[in-house]
Amino acid sequence: MVRVLNDIHQHKSLILNVDGGCEPKNPGGIATCGWVFFDGKNKVLADDYRVVRDGGPLATNNFAEYCALGLALRWLKEQNWRGNLFIRADSKLLVEQVN
């Protein structure tokens, strides 16, 4: 469930951090992801985390990383927010494919 701490509409620019992982094994573990929107002063505006797949061959780190990005962007679209978005991620694959 998304936790909203501050109104994103008061900001023209947002920073989005996304992350995902699969434990205790990759592939086949429990894939989880999370995202956080910050303002320009590192103040948390909204965040979420969840299990996105519980086992099976599709439960991978890469799947979880992309879920984090997709869920965050979907939520942002639902808020009808417009502005500049800066995305930060530690997944080399995600960064290179999205950039």
PLM segments and residue spans:
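RNase H-like nuclease fold core
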Residues: 2-63, 74-79
